[in-house]
């Protein structure tokens, strides 16, 4: 084994890259480390593409091993299970900047596996994994236009911080990850506390400039450890077939893209393609239909892009900066705690908000420890939303990613747990989709939360932007359609309110996107965002003052800490019976604070009353209605308060002499008893005799009513 190591300084951290020792049978492997956080990244690439392969099969797997943090997995099997949400998001984070750097026509299967083998809680493994992936691909010899660098940028005390630690991030107004080559930014993922467009763009450029140290180091590492470059050539293009397809389909494609309705346009394109295939196969039975399909798609792209660059109207007839028609409705579902239907053109989201208690919070067992998630946002993209059939079930990577992006957009305006002590779950059901569904989810989530009465600081809106660039000309597109997303050069999504940005996600497919272009795109996005916010605020200007009648209400009571055990009971028996009998949820804090949650206030009041009884102290001289719990030779034990019994001595049962307790009392009888004494050991002495004496007061001189006379007789 001949290890090759590269070490360099990256801001406040030291990065180490090593190859040649571990996983030597992979096409390439790199052990990347930053301050005790270590990720093993392997790349395996097949030398030949599978026959008939018509897409690039790149797979990225990111896995966190619990041994990396010195922990043993929970559960029966004591093994790592399905990928966590964080692992899925990190897979996407790695995939997005590397995918555009593989050449067109490269169809060989490539698998990247990043395994976290050691973790320092202060250093997030995602940046380490990105750097390791870049290094492994660079030394592998596969056709890859890298290396790339990656950086996390924070804002602490209004200063940019490169790769902040976990402690620094807690005080940061920004958590931004940027990746790119030496010439261009390729990917941005961020969450912000209402920062301006200039601050966000400054962070992107700061990170891109800082990552040049990584790119330089990986280039040097590749020169020393890199394998021989693959002798791969892109398949030669069939120019005669291109010419033929242009003749057969160009006019039909052009006419189809004058159709503003998505379904109608798709139908026309399918018809043009079918006619093209018929004519091609009539002339040559052996024509390559897969290649024909690619050429047809490229022709679509050329036509749409050239029209946009020429200043013509967009696919659906809009100007570049125009937002589609917006429709907003709140309170659309009768029994949910909050709901909204947000429609923008042919994109629609049905969003609900549900309020729960702390018991409903999500407990996440991460490498760095247990975390409690009290705000969940889930995004669902069923096949019917694009008029297709398909599998319906657990969320895919894309759905998890879009849900997290929408959550980032909303997080900055959410109230603290002290201000609003509820667990909140928002679900966005995409019911129609033609571009920008994640940003529709941001808008719908804001509306649903306000409809539920959640005191968010302001409305939040999101917008998806696109870019078409040809040579020195470029056009920025607001509120892009699905087709414009596929055919454009940049896709970026911005969420925020009137004061600033809460989330920014950017994916750039080409070089040459300058700071000026990104600046103008962000300015255009702000204008679109403010327009959407105006429409939303007209529908619901702020959160509702009253919660839904179906939402739980909290009632709080404080008890002595030494009384907590009385409310819980042995094995939780008391609190279990209490919640079941009153139809409530009860949560007890270590400081003795008890929160009772109930949809019906009467249920909450009943639970509070029972808790008061459970935690009340027995008072000397007070008369209680006690229940006989046990009879002994020398008296009876009577329960005066839940869990608190006292002894009525045989001499205190009646005025006359009592020889047999059973002649006067039986188990279950409810009798008045007076507390005579509580001794040093906490034992309670009771008296039925004195309770009866106190109860017998002189009758009034006025004649008693007949009913009252009967009652007096019964008492005697």
From Swiss-Prot:
Q: Which GO terms describe its molecular function?
A: 3'-5'-RNA exonuclease activity; magnesium ion binding; polyribonucleotide nucleotidyltransferase activity; RNA binding
Any single GO CC term annotated in Swiss-Prot or TrEMBL for this entry? cytosol
Q: Where is this region: Disordered?
A: 689-716
E.C. number(s) listed in UniProt: 2.7.7.8
| Cofactor(s) required, per the database record | Mg(2+)
Q: What is catalysed by this protein?
A: RNA(n+1) + phosphate = RNA(n) + a ribonucleoside 5'-diphosphate
Q: Which residues form the KH domain?
A: 552-611
User: What residue spans carry the Basic and acidic residues bias annotation?
Assistant: 689-698
Report the subcellular localization: Cytoplasm
Query: Where is composition skewed (Acidic residues) in this entry?
Result: 707-716
> Carries keyword Transmembrane helix?
no
Q: What CDD domains does the entry give?
A: KH-I_PNPase, RNase_PH_PNPase_1, RNase_PH_PNPase_2, S1_PNPase
Name the predominant localization: cytoplasm
S1 motif domain span: 621-689
Query: Which UniProt keywords are listed?
Result: Cytoplasm, Magnesium, Metal-binding, Nucleotidyltransferase, RNA-binding, Transferase
Q: Name one GO biological process term.
A: RNA processing
| HAMAP family, alphabetized | PNPase
Describe its partners and assembly state: Component of the RNA degradosome, which is a multiprotein complex involved in RNA processing and mRNA degradation.
Q: Which family does it belong to?
A: Belongs to the polyribonucleotide nucleotidyltransferase family.
The entry's protein name is Polyribonucleotide nucleotidyltransferase
Say which species the protein is native to: Idiomarina loihiensis (strain ATCC BAA-735 / DSM 15497 / L2-TR)
Q: Which gene encodes it?
A: pnp
């Amino acid at each position: 084994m001949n290890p090759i190591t590269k070490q360099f300084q990256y801001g406040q951290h030291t990065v180490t890259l090593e190859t040649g020792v571990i996983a030597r049978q992979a096409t390439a492997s790199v052990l990347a480390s930053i301050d005790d956080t270590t990720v093993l990244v392997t790349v395996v690439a097949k030398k030949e593409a599978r026959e008939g392969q018509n897409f690039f099969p790149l797979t990225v797997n990111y896995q966190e091993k619990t041994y990396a943090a010195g922990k043993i997995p929970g559960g029966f099997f004591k093994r790592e299970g399905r990928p966590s949400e964080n692992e899925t998001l990190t897979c996407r984070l790695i995939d997005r900047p590397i995918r555009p750097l593989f050449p067109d026509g490269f169809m060989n299967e490539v698998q990247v596996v990043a395994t976290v083998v050691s973790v320092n809680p202060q250093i997030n493994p995602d940046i380490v994994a990105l750097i390791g992936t870049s290094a492994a691909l660079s030394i592998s010899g596969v056709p890859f236009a890298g290396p790339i660098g990656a950086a996390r940028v924070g804002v602490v005390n209004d200063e940019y911080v490169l790769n902040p630690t976990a402690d620094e991030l807690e005080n940061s107004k920004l958590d931004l990850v940027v990746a790119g080559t030496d010439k261009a930014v390729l990917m941005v993922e961020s969450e912000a506390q209402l920062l301006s467009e200039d601050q966000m763009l400054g962070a992107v450029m700061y990170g891109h400039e800082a990552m040049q140290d990584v790119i330089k180091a990986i280039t040097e590492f590749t020169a020393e450890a890199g394998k021989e470059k693959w002798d791969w050539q892109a398949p030669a293009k069939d120019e005669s077939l291109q010419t033929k397809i242009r003749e057969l389909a160009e006019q039909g494609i052009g006419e189809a893209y004058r159709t503003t309705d998505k379904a109608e346009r798709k139908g026309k394109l399918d018809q043009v393609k079918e006619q093209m295939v018929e004519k091609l196969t009539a002339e040559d039975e052996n024509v390559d239909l897969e290649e024909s399909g690619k050429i047809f798609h490229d022709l679509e792209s050329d036509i749409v892009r050239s029209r946009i660059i020429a200043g013509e109207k967009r696919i659906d007839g809009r100007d570049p900066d125009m937002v589609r028609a917006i429709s907003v409705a709140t309170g659309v579902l009768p029994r949910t705690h909050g709901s909204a239907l947000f429609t923008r053109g042919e994109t629609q989201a049905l969003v609900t908000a549900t309020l729960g208690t702390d018991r409903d919070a999500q407990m996440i067992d991460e490498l760095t420890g247990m975390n409690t998630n009290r705000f969940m946002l889930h995004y669902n993209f069923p096949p019917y939303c694009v008029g297709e059939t398909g599998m319906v079930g657990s969320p895919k990577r894309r759905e998890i990613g879009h849900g997290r992006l929408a959550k980032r957009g909303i997080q900055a305006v959410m109230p603290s747990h002290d201000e609003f002590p509820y667990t909140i779950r928002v679900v966005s059901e995409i019911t129609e989709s033609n571009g920008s569904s994640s940003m529709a989810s941001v808008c719908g989530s804001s509306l649903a939360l306000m409809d539920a009465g959640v005191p968010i600081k302001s409305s939040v809106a999101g917008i998806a932007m696109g870019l078409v660039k040809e040579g020195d000309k470029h056009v920025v597109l607001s509120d892009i359609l699905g087709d414009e997303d596929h055919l454009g050069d940049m896709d970026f999504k911005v969420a925020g309110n009137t004061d600033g940005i809460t989330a920014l996600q950017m994916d750039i497919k080409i070089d040459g996107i300058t700071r000026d272009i990104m600046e103008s795109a962000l300015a255009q996005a702000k204008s679109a965002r403010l327009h959407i916010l105006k429409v939303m605020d007209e529908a619901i200007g702020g959160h509702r003052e009253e919660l839904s009648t179906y939402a739980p209400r909290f009632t709080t009571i404080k008890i002595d800490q030494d009384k907590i055990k009385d409310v819980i009971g042995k094995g939780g028996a008391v609190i279990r019976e209490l919640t079941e009998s009153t139809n409530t949820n009860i949560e007890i804090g270590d400081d003795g604070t008890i929160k009772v949650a109930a949809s019906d206030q009467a249920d909450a009041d009943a639970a509070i009353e029972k808790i008061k009884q459970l935690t009340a102290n027995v008072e000397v001289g007070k008369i209680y209605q006690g229940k006989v719990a046990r009879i002994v030779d020398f008296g009876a034990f009577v329960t005066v308060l839940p869990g608190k019994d006292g002894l009525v001595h045989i001499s205190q049962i009646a005025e006359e002499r009592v020889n047999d307790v059973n002649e006067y009392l039986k188990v279950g009888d409810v009798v008045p008893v007076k507390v005579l004494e509580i001794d040093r050991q906490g034992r309670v002495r009771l008296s039925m005799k004195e309770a009866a004496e106190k109860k017998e007061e002189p009758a009034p001189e006025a004649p008693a009513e007949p009913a009252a006379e009967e009652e007096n007789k019964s008492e005697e």
